[in-house]
Regions:
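Active-site residues of response regulator receiver
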Residues: 56, 84
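Recognition helix of helix-turn-helix DNA-binding domains
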Residues: 160-193
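Acidic, metal-coordinating helix/loop segments flanking the phosphotransfer/catalytic sites
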Residues: 34-52
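C-terminal output helix
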Residues: 88-90, 104, 108-117, 167
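Non-catalytic signal-transmission and effector/linker regions of two-component phosphorelay proteins
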Residues: 1-9, 15, 22, 37, ...
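Basic, Lys/Arg-enriched C-terminal extension of HTH/homeodomain DNA-binding domains
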Residues: 183-209
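Acidic catalytic/metal-coordinating carboxylates
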Residues: 36-37, 63-66
Length: 209
């Protein structure tokens, strides 16, 4: 892994299991944070580092499946690996349909869990990279002036500078100036690249996007 050390969160109400998992995770070069309940885990602020969650299904109060449902919307960058000593088919199906990365039944082989953790962390890193790219794109778009946004909106539909000028009531030379600044701010190397950016930002505004 490059950059930040991956964090593996563990939620299990069994003290011995938490201690064993913490040692195992640390032996793989990851940072481990353990919690005895879902409520303890939910009190922990979200991290912006590659991470995954090793989660016991049967927990007191808020169980593992309910926790999965609670964090599904705002922690898509944190894959979940379920572990349990007693699993039934409906439980496994529900967990996997909701996006679980893996479902392991205790006792499980340490290497199997470590492989699942590596895959989950890689997936988390990929999601975080995509989120960072999206934030960067939105920030670049936010830096545009109102006029530059108007020019961009028309350019990505295929209009020529002269047509853009006619619609906005400005000269073709002025359109070229705004277009040049807009392209630089958006870091777009070509019209096709700009169209792709617009499709990501506002899909409905780009024909056939």
């Amino acid at each position: 892994m490059r950059g930040a050390v991956p964090i593996v969160f563990v939620v299990d109400d069994d003290d011995l299991v938490r201690e064993w998992l913490e040692l195992l995770i640390q032996s793989a070069g990851c940072r481990a944070e353990t919690f005895a309940s879902a409520e303890e885990f939910l009190a922990r602020p979200r991290v912006l580092s590659p991470s995954c969650l090793v989660l016991e299904v049967k927990l007191p109060h808020l169980n593992g499946l309910d926790l999965q449902e609670r964090i599904a919307a705002d922690r898509v960058d944190m894959p979940i690996i379920f572990i349990t000593g007693d699993a039934d088919i409906p439980t496994i199906v529900r967990a996997m349909k909701a996006g679980a990365a893996e479902f392991l039944t205790k006792p499980f082989d340490a290497d199997v869990l470590l492989n699942a953790i590596r895959e989950a962390v890689d997936r988390s890193e990929c999601v975080l990279r995509q989120e960072a790219k999206m934030r960067s794109l939105r920030n670049r778009y936010a830096s545009l002036t109102a006029r530059e946004r108007e020019v961009m909106d028309l350019v990505v539909t295929g209009e020529l500078n002269k047509q853009v000028g006619g619609e906005l009531g400005i000269s073709e030379i002025t359109v070229k100036a705004h277009r040049g600044k807009m392209m630089r701010k958006m870091q777009a190397g070509s019209l096709i690249e700009l169209v792709n950016m617009a499709a990501i930002l506002r899909p409905a505004s780009v024909p056939n996007a």
